[in-house]
C-alpha cells in the first residue's frame, strides 16, 4: 500500500473512534459501549452495598449512676429525690397505689397462658420492688419485680404506654431497689431463643412509690456476710429468699402450736414480763428499775408461776407464747431474749404430756416439711456433715440415772440420797475420773447436770430423758415410784433440748421446802437458783389440782425445721454488740 493509502486509512480509523470521558481515551464505539455497561453494573453494586451499610449508631444515653460507688450513689440519688420532693413531678412518695391482685395470685391465675399469648382486655395493677432492670433498645424495657416472695416480669413497650411522650422520663427515673406500682395487661412472653416464656405484665403505666436511695448489693456476689445480715435484717430479707422462708417457717411453727392447743380447748393468756421475784426456772435474770415504784424488778425468765396460779383459779387449760429473758451467755443455741410456749393442763401428768409431745411435734414436722424425716447440718465449719432426724412416733425414752450408771460404769446412790454431801464427793470423783469440768459452784444439781450432758450428746433423733432428781427440778412433783426423783422429762434432738415438762408439784408444804433448798444453793453462790416466792406458795395453799406443765423453745424448733445451725438465723433481730463497741473491742484485741 502506498503512503497515501496509509494516511487515508489512519484518518478513517480516527474518525470512527469515540472519546471515553471517564478516562480521556479515544476508543471504538463497541469498546465504549462495553465500558459504559461495565460501569453501570459497578454503580448498581456500589449503590446496593451503600444501602446495606448499617446506620451510624446513635449515642447511648448517659447513665449518671452507672459508675458510682455506694457512697456516691447515695449522694446522687438523694439529690435527685430531694429535687422531686420539691417539684412533685412526680411525687416520689405518693400516699396510695391501688393493687388489684397480689403477685402470687397473679402468677397462679395466669399460669395457664401459652407461649406468646396475651390478654389485652385483662387489666391488672401490681406493686413490688425492682430487683433487675434491662433495656433492649429505647422502646423496650424489662423489669423483675419482687413482692410477696415471688418474682414477676414486667415488659414495657413504647407502643403500649399510656403517654408515649413521658415513656423515657418515667423509666429513666426508676432504679434497682425502687418500689413501684404497675398497671398493664396480662400475657406470656415469646422469647426468640426458645423456652416457655414468662407470665408478665405488659406495662401501660408505671409509678414510683418509694425510691431506694442506696445501691443494692449485686446479685452476682449477693449479700452473704453473716454479721452484716444480722445487723441489717431488712436488707437480708430484700436480697435473700432463704432468709424470708426461714421466718415464714418460724411463723408456721407458732401457728401450728397455737392451733393444736386451741383445738384442745386451751385458753391463751398473757402474764407479766416484769416481776418482783425471778421464778419459774433456774436461770440468771435481767434486773431493771421501776421509777414510779422506786424498786428493782426482774425481767421474767419463765411464765410458769403465773400460769399455775391461773389453774388454781379454775382455768384448767392455759398457755402462753411469749418472750423470756435470761442474763446468760450467747452462743450457737442461746440468745438472752428468746421465745417459748408453756401450757398447763389440770388432771394431766407427765405421761400424758409425753404422748401429747410426740403427737404435736411429729405432726407439725410432717405438715410443715411434708415428711417426718428432715435433714439437718449442725456444724457450720463442716457443711458436709448431715444428720437425718426422724420425728415419727414412738420416740426413744431414757431413764436418766440408769443410763448414767451404764455410761460411767458406776452405781449411783439411791434417789433420796442424791442431795447429800457424800453424793457430792461421789459426783466430783466421776467428773475428775472422766476429765469433765463443771463450772463452780459445785452443787450436786450442777454436777449432775454436767454428767447428763454426756447423755444428751447421744440424742440425735427425738429422745425423752426422764427420771430427774428432785433437786434439779424444784417445781416438779416427786416420783410416785422412786423416792428422791421426780416426774419430769426433757426432749433432746440433735443433742439440743427443745422441750421440758413435768407433773406439777401441788403440795404447798413440799414446795416451800424446795424453795428453801434453792435459797440455800443461792447462798452457796449459785446465781441461777430460785428465791422463795410467797405469792405462789400462798396460791398453792388454795389448792392446785393435779396438773401437767409443759414448755418448749420456739427458736430451737425453728432451727431444726429450717436447717439453721445458729439461733441468730431464726431471730429477726438477734442480740449483737453495737458496731461502735465491736470496733473498740477489735482494736483492743489487735493491740
UniProtKB/Swiss-Prot annotation:
Domain of life per record:
Eukaryota
Q: Could you confirm whether the keyword Nucleotide-binding appears in this record?
A: yes
Task: Please give the residue positions where the record annotates the modification Phosphothreonine.
Answer: 62
Question: Which UniProt keywords are present, listed alphabetically?
Answer: Acetylation, Aminoacyl-tRNA synthetase, ATP-binding, Cytoplasm, Isopeptide bond, Ligase, Nucleotide-binding, Phosphoprotein, Protein biosynthesis, Ubl conjugation
Say where the protein is mainly found.
cytoplasm
**Family as reported in the entry's similarity comment:** Belongs to the class-II aminoacyl-tRNA synthetase family.
HAMAP family according to UniProt? Lys_tRNA_synth_class2
- Please give the name of this protein: Lysine--tRNA ligase, cytoplasmic
The record lists the lineage as: Eukaryota, Fungi, Dikarya, Ascomycota, Saccharomycotina
Gene symbol?
Answer: KRS1
Amino acid at each position: 500500500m502506498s503512503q497515501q493509502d496509509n494516511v487515508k486509512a489512519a484518518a478513517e480509523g480516527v474518525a470512527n473512534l469515540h472519546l471515553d470521558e471517564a478516562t480521556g481515551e479515544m476508543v471504538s464505539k463497541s469498546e465504549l459501549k462495553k465500558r459504559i455497561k461495565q460501569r453501570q453494573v459497578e454503580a448498581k453494586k456500589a449503590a446496593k452495598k451503600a444501602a446495606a451499610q448499617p446506620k451510624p449508631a446513635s449515642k447511648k444515653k448517659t447513665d449518671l449512676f452507672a459508675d458510682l460507688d455506694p457512697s456516691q450513689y447515695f449522694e446522687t440519688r438523694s439529690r435527685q429525690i430531694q429535687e422531686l420532693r420539691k417539684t412533685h413531678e412526680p411525687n416520689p412518695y405518693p400516699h396510695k397505689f391501688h393493687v388489684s391482685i397480689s403477685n402470687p395470685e397473679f402468677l397462679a391465675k395466669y399460669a395457664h397462658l401459652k407461649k406468646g399469648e396475651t390478654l389485652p382486655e385483662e387489666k391488672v395493677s401490681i406493686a413490688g420492688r425492682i430487683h433487675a432492670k434491662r433495656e433492649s433498645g429505647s422502646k423496650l424495657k424489662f423489669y423483675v419485680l419482687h413482692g410477696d416472695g415471688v418474682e414477676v416480669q414486667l415488659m414495657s413497650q413504647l407502643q403500649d404506654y399510656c403517654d408515649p411522650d413521658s415513656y423515657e422520663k418515667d423509666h429513666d427515673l426508676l432504679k434497682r431497689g425502687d418500689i413501684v406500682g404497675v398497671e398493664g395487661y396480662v400475657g406470656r412472653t415469646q422469647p426468640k431463643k426458645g423456652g416457655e416464656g414468662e407470665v408478665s405484665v405488659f406495662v401501660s403505666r408505671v409509678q414510683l412509690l418509694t425510691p431506694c436511695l442506696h445501691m443494692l448489693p449485686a446479685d452476682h456476689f449477693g449479700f452473704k456476710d453473716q454479721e452484716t445480715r444480722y445487723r441489717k435484717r431488712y436488707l437480708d430479707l430484700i436480697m435473700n429468699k432463704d432468709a424470708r422462708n426461714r421466718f415464714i417457717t418460724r411463723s408456721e411453727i407458732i401457728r401450728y402450736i397455737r392451733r393444736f392447743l386451741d383445738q384442745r380447748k386451751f385458753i391463751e393468756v398473757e402474764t407479766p414480763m416484769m416481776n418482783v421475784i425471778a421464778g419459774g426456772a433456774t436461770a440468771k435474770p435481767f434486773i431493771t428499775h421501776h421509777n414510779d415504784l422506786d424498786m428493782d424488778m426482774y425481767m421474767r425468765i419463765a411464765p410458769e408461776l403465773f400460769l399455775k396460779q391461773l389453774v388454781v383459779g379454775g382455768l384448767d387449760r392455759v398457755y402462753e407464747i411469749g418472750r423470756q429473758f435470761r442474763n446468760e451467755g450467747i452462743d450457737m443455741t442461746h440468745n438472752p431474749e428468746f421465745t417459748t410456749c408453756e401450757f398447763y393442763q389440770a388432771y394431766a401428768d407427765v405421761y400424758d404430756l409425753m404422748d401429747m409431745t410426740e403427737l404435736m411435734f411429729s405432726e407439725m414436722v410432717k405438715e410443715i416439711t411434708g415428711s417426718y424425716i428432715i435433714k439437718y447440718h449442725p456444724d457450720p465449719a463442716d457443711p458436709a456433715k448431715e444428720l437425718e432426724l426422724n420425728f415419727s412416733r414412738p420416740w426413744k425414752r431414757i431413764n436418766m440415772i440408769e443410763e448414767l450408771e451404764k455410761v460411767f460404769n458406776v452405781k449411783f446412790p439411791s434417789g433420796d440420797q442424791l442431795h447429800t454431801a457424800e453424793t457430792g464427793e461421789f459426783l466430783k470423783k466421776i467428773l475428775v475420773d472422766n476429765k469433765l469440768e463443771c463450772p463452780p459452784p459445785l452443787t450436786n444439781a450442777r454436777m449432775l447436770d454436767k454428767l447428763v450432758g454426756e447423755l444428751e450428746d447421744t440424742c440425735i433423733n427425738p429422745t425423752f430423758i426422764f427420771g430427774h432428781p428432785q433437786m434439779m427440778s424444784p417445781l416438779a412433783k416427786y416420783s410416785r415410784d422412786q423416792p428422791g426423783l421426780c416426774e419430769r422429762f426433757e426432749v433432746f434432738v440433735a443433742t439440743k433440748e427443745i422441750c421440758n415438762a413435768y407433773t406439777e408439784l401441788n403440795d404447798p408444804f413440799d414446795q416451800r421446802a424446795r424453795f428453801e433448798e434453792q435459797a440455800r444453793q443461792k447462798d452457796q453462790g449459785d446465781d441461777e437458783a430460785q428465791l422463795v416466792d410467797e405469792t405462789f406458795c400462798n396460791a398453792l395453799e388454795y389448792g392446785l389440782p393435779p396438773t401437767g406443765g409443759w414448755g418448749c423453745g420456739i427458736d430451737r424448733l425453728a432451727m431444726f425445721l429450717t436447717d439453721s445451725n445458729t439461733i441468730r438465723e431464726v431471730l429477726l433481730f438477734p442480740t449483737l454488740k453495737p458496731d461502735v463497741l465491736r470496733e473498740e473491742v477489735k482494736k483492743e484485741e489487735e493491740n
